[in-house]
Amino acid sequence: MGPGLLTFTSTPPMIPDTLPRSVWPITLDDIAAARDRIRPFVPVSPFRGYPVLDAALGNDIRVWLKHENFNPTGAFKIRNAFSLLTALSDEERRRGIVAATRGNHGLGLAYAGKTFGVPVTICVPLGNNPEKNEGMRALGARLIEEGKDYDESLAVSERIVREAGAYLAHSTNNAHIIAGAGTMSLEIAEQEPNLDALVIAVGGGSQAVGAMTVMRAMRPHVRVYAVQAAGASATHDGWHARAPRVTATPATTFADGLATRSTYELTFPALCDGLADFITVTDAQIAHALRLLLRTTHTLVEGAGATGLAGLLALKERLAGQRVGVVVSGGNIDDQTLRRVVNREI
């Protein structure tokens, strides 16, 4: 067993919390239990360094990329989906699940639903990524296209749940979802125990809260930085104001996986308590990071998946000389958007 490596049986070790559950929605025990449940379905994803990327970053930074874009369905959200479906009762599964998504949450739920024979209904906004829509349908999900953005599609999903009595699988406001996201950081803590910092993109905040929960318990020296698209900055703005926020205008970013316009009650208090800092990056910065990943790692990522690296580029003076982990959260970019990025139209 390598240094810093932990293994959990079906009954993980008890590790005391450092904050009340009212602030932190999950514990390390919850994440360990989620990992045990999803282990048969979700392989450990690579955590890999690239000397050519280090050279491009400069400032004596060494970076490791957590390749969630290599997962089944191409994103970290499959962890969340299996964490949720393996925790539901038989009766909850029988009634089916309903969710709103811009794609990756829905793909994960459709994949897990097909695995367990659970009916899945997904609500997406009009004009959603057509390739993500195609993928969800291919996995057997019922797709409802309604609303101008994620938040309006979420309202549609809540209406369907009230009418049909199904289970609402919220992409953030669910402890099983957050615990599933935390399994990624549990792997990171074991794969590279000597990190100084993690840089993580934030939409609703499940990744970041999962990461902070793990690092506070296992690697308390690791500082977690959050980054959000400037065109969808409700959580960033609320964090700096120390107050929950909902914006009336639709999110505007090609990083559709981050395109939300509100904070969420289960994640926002922990984000306020635990983050080292929270920054925004423009679509141009995200597109630059995406092209850099294509050139230096030869892996395909979507806008949300490149946002962590965009954040590291913005923070590279502050993180000079450090060992930094960056989550590549997904790779489901459609061909039209990829063409625009490669042609420097974004």
Residue ranges and their predicted role:
Residues 1-9:
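Low-complexity, intrinsically disordered Ser/Thr/Pro- and acidic-rich segments
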